Amino acid sequence: MKPSIFADAVITACQACDGHALAELFAIGGGVAASALLELGDVRPGGMICSLRKCSGYLGSPWEDMCVNHLRSLYSFSLASSLPASASDAVDGEGKTRSERLGEAFDAYNSVVSAFVRYFSTLTPGRWALPLLRILCLNLRWLAVQADSAAHIASVSNTWAPTRSTQPNKRLEECARQLNKAFSACIADRNADMHESRKWGTYEVVGMVFKTYFRLKSVGLCRNILRAINAADLPDLCAYPRSQQVTFRYYVGVLAFLNEEYDHAELELQASLQMCHRCALINQGLILTYLIPVKLLKGSLPHPSLLDPTTPIGRKLAVYQPFTRALRTGDVKAFDQALANPTIESSLVKRGTYIAIERARDATLRTLLKTIWLSLPLNPTNTRPTRLTLTLLHHATSTDLIRLKYSIKELEWILATLIYKGYVKGYIAHERGVLVLSAKDAFPALRTVAIATT
């Protein structure tokens, strides 16, 4: 496809308000991109403009600049693809490395996105252009990740070279700024006709913004996006495509989880899981990564098959297997050993679930105490005993079966903590060394216990 034919295709799609056709034309991959590369001709900006202007129609603003930069990006990306990713010092015919070519591809495509977002922010009605906005944002983010990855490999392999003033994730940070502008262009639409509003692209872009912020470890910036959404007059979330609902509710749930708002996190993550397509196993695994710790805190244990490391989902979730077993049986020793395992600890810290799992230890202690209580003989009135001596509890927890090395004073402190947090109903008669349990519901169901975050 010659540049002039490419330009005519863009003109036709614009006149027809065909966002899907434009998305296909401005995609980095696909048949159109491959066809355009075959007959690109003069790759200099001036030469490209001349080639584009040979079209039969008029390529107005911002489409001419977008076409030039898009074709430049395709050219740079094709040269980068011809170089091996493992050989960071390999150069093409013009003496440029893969890292440099990917940087050029990103910069050129960033100019495409910037020009379109400026145009899109004033477009009324603008809903027809949402497919193009989506593909531009997706491709920009993908190029940013590729360029930053190549730059990192080059900087690591060329340690002998003079130090350059480069920053990690430089392009991804620029991508985040562009995505923010795209989000503003969608949410700020004042078109009275909601059916044709740009607001229908809000949650699509928000999903990309959240994903980018999480990769940049700038999770706090997501709060600004949520505040803007709450203040905006948007259609109900349920009116958007289900895929966008799943993504949005997943990230809202994770944000609530990281902020230790476990009730809210459970609500959002549960809704996201229920709407997730049954074949989207990777997405289900991501959701369950945070939902399972919340469920453990509430005393709801996953089925063992869900944590089976031989299944696609289980491989990602198997790290929770020792904790669910310990919580089910009250095996505090096994819980502590799993938490102290360097591999498990590293995995939990990386996911951001370590603190939540650590908090489940109180629930495991409560299960242990209840198990001991249930093993005691009944009173003459055929009821469970409500007075347990600390000496008895200390002896029970020190047996070879349980193996907890607590002194009586430490055990008393643990019991007082469980009572304070609501895991046990009763009080400690310190002077007599007796735990006095409530005659009714001495061990409340875990789902009814408020999760302490201090």
UniProtKB/Swiss-Prot annotation:
Residues 246-442 form the PCI domain. InterPro entries: Csn12-like (IPR045114), PCI_dom (IPR000717), WH-like_DNA-bd_sf (IPR036388). GO terms for molecular function: double-stranded DNA binding; RNA binding. Transmembrane segments: none annotated. One of its GO terms (cellular component) is transcription export complex 2. It comes from the Eukaryota. GO terms for biological process: poly(A)+ mRNA export from nucleus; post-transcriptional tethering of RNA polymerase II gene DNA at nuclear periphery; transcription elongation by RNA polymerase II. Belongs to the CSN12 family. This is Protein CSN12 homolog. The lineage of its organism: Eukaryota, Fungi, Dikarya, Basidiomycota, Ustilaginomycotina. The gene is CSN12.
